[in-house]
Amino acid sequence: LILERGLKITWSCNARADVPLDLLQLMKKAGGREMCVGFESASPEVLKNIRKGVKNTDKAIEFVKNARKANLLVHGCFMVGNPGDTRETLRMTLDYAKKLSPNTAQFYPIMAYPGTEAYREALESGALQTKDYNQWLDKDGFHRTTIQRGELSSQDLVDFCDKARREFYLRPSYILRQGIMSIRNPKERYRVFRGFKTLVKHLFRKHGELNTLARQAPTNKE
């Protein structure tokens, strides 16, 4: 319809990780800019537990390659704290995110909102630690979680997401790729710069919290 009406617009959308190349190319021709995809996890068991439509990680990798061929950006979403998650599956998911290497990625712990299946599952399994909604966000408005999975505490899940962001975005290969894209595509330069500022702010926020804790910690002199 966009092509038929000759609309000159730029748009982004959510997408499954199995959109074929010919459709991706058509989406680009119609003004598509970015696909937001919920890859979520590298664990087949976890993907099955949360009823993801695309459980084949190889197919997802092929999708990202095809999106690049179509000159479309990919924003990857990864969620931890799902049923079946362990320290091993979290590590697998981070490695998977690096292998996929979407243009941008977000790592967040699961947010089990009341009225959702995730909330019901967490309540029935005992994974939900509190019903206090104030615990869902920290003082700066960043996501926390009220879910605990086995040996993984809610703080473990939050800490992993912070670690995942650092490992994903501070890779030399990623920084180089983003720099090249900014040079080749001036339209994306501002978005890349803005994203970098947000990342640095987040990293310094975490660093500041650690420094505060260090100053508050008792010393031998005390």
Per-range role (PLM):
Residues 2-186, 214-221:
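A structural motif corresponding to the C-terminal lobe/cap of the Radical SAM core domain
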Residues 192-222:
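Short linear elements at protein peripheries
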